């Protein structure tokens, strides 16, 4: 029932409701809001690198460096405070994507003149080659784990478009045989191999707000993002009913907005302090209560590089006052 208290409880729990007799207000607690805070800067400025892991055990690797066509094979781990160099990737590349944890990650595709289909796995101490990806390889979308990943096409070598989707079992890639509905690259995806969410990206001639959901057998159109954007980088994570989509570039500007997905619709969350695109981010499946977003570029022409890291945290609860309207 509703408690009658002289003051707000010191340690309320989510869902608790009480009447504050001093302020004459009916109050309750709900799940807290998410916000971004400053983290440790990357040792190397880069954009379009891959990411994996969590806010306290993260991984960032590869990417484009200032002075195109410079690309990186550097790899760094994050402990929630600072970044530490780890063994380099075997192949330097920009626009690489990946997923997994800080000790079991997979990196896929990218550009090294021309686009490549290379797949590498990281085990916490070294990178090793795996079987090549068979689809469009630059700015593709990947989610899941090192041994059960889902990927949708990016930009194929040369010109053209493709909408194939693939799964990875820790050894090789397989074509699902079921294409997603709209060709786009530079989008973001979260979830697992049997339930994923694909949103945003660059369509031919326009920036996309479209969302598609994957149920293990087919793709279905979902609710559009509130803000259409591409050049998202490795910057979405969560599940098909609880996901996060961060930052990117609209047709005219780089944005820092965060949107949260509940399985049906998108809600605006807290903004990054530094709006940017093409950053490395946390793993693509798992909890949405914390994460990181590191590096990237902060201007619309995608030429101003930054090493900034920001950390996303959702508080356990917040107190709300009930009102009558």
Predicted regions and their residues:
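Polar, enzyme-active/binding microenvironments
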Residues: 1-325
